[in-house]
Amino acid sequence: MMKPIEAALSGSPLRALLGATLLMALASCSSVPNIFGAKTAAMTRVYVDPQGGERAQLRMSVDGSGANGRVYPANSCPRWQEPRSGWVMTSVFGIPLFGTAHTGRSLGTRSAMEAKGLTSGEVYLRANELVTLAYDMGTSDGHYNYGCLAGVAFTPVANHHYHAIARWVGRQQCAVMLFDVDEQGVAK
């Protein structure tokens, strides 16, 4: 008999992150052939900035938990097979894993809020092309481990600066906030 998700993910926070990653793969945007047809390399691929053409800048951030942030160009859902998709940032137990993907990378992207306490990574996006940003997050309250999947799809505008922030909202829910930040650092 299947256990509830919080029981199925009990154990270490790392296990919660792995469970959250699996749940993301099983989300409504995926199918079984989609998940198992993808190579492991595709699931761990680092996002590569588009070269040439019009671009926008993106800062992906997460507050104080274990999380992964990924970009899926030309898709309204996470698609592992998209060859341009990849990891942007990661943290474990709220500690940034600098040198992993683009964690800690700064392009001078304007921020929607003070970066203190946030793990971030910055990349370029192709302008005028749909993109999905997806986070898988994990945390623990000492009794249970929780996994959460959140994402947003949008079409970036050339030369704009975007800031996506994933955070826990309560103990068992998370959300992604996406800001278009102007020259004065004000979120539109």
What are these regions, as identified by a protein language model?
Residues 2-18:
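Bacterial N-terminal signal peptides that target proteins for export
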Residues 18-20, 149:
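Generic hydrophobic-segment detector
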Residues 25-28:
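C-terminal motif of bacterial Sec signal peptides marking the signal peptidase cleavage site
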Residues 30-153, 163-188:
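Short loop/turn and low-complexity linker motifs enriched in small/turn-promoting residues
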